[in-house]
Amino acid sequence: MINRQQVEKIAHLARLEITPAEEEAFAPQLNSILQYFDQLSELDTENVPPMTRAIELSNITRSDRTETYGDRESLLKSAPEQEGDFFRVPQIMNNDQE
């Protein structure tokens, strides 16, 4: 059973800022999801072959190819922040280890 403190830890690990009221609201929701997984684990899958996707489609994405863009300056000017000839983006990874 997931409690409020565990929801707080999960939110911290996911880098989410949630209020104590949201922690209280999410605990029963997460417990409901876990109960559903418990139900799924009761299914007999002995004779079900493993699969990686529900339908057999593969390579449905476009091929990667480089393209030139004529107006580099206007592209750089449209960025919220730039540093020299590069876009400056917020840092998404840090070194604190949990």
UniProtKB/Swiss-Prot annotation:
First-level EC class: ligase
Keywords on record: ATP-binding, Ligase, Nucleotide-binding, Protein biosynthesis
EC number(s) on file: 6.3.5.-
Annotated GO MF terms: asparaginyl-tRNA synthase (glutamine-hydrolyzing) activity; ATP binding; glutaminyl-tRNA synthase (glutamine-hydrolyzing) activity
Signal peptide range in chain numbering: none
Record field: catalytic activity: L-glutamyl-tRNA(Gln) + L-glutamine + ATP + H2O = L-glutaminyl-tRNA(Gln) + L-glutamate + ADP + phosphate + H(+); L-aspartyl-tRNA(Asn) + L-glutamine + ATP + H2O = L-asparaginyl-tRNA(Asn) + L-glutamate + ADP + phosphate + 2 H(+)
Xref: Pfam families: GatC (PF02686)
GO biological process: glutaminyl-tRNAGln biosynthesis via transamidation; regulation of translational fidelity; translation
Assembly description: Heterotrimer of A, B and C subunits.
Family: Belongs to the GatC family.
Biological function: Allows the formation of correctly charged Asn-tRNA(Asn) or Gln-tRNA(Gln) through the transamidation of misacylated Asp-tRNA(Asn) or Glu-tRNA(Gln) in organisms which lack either or both of asparaginyl-tRNA or glutaminyl-tRNA synthetases. The reaction takes place in the presence of glutamine and ATP through an activated phospho-Asp-tRNA(Asn) or phospho-Glu-tRNA(Gln).
Name the UniProt record assigns to this protein: Aspartyl/glutamyl-tRNA(Asn/Gln) amidotransferase subunit C
Underlying gene: gatC
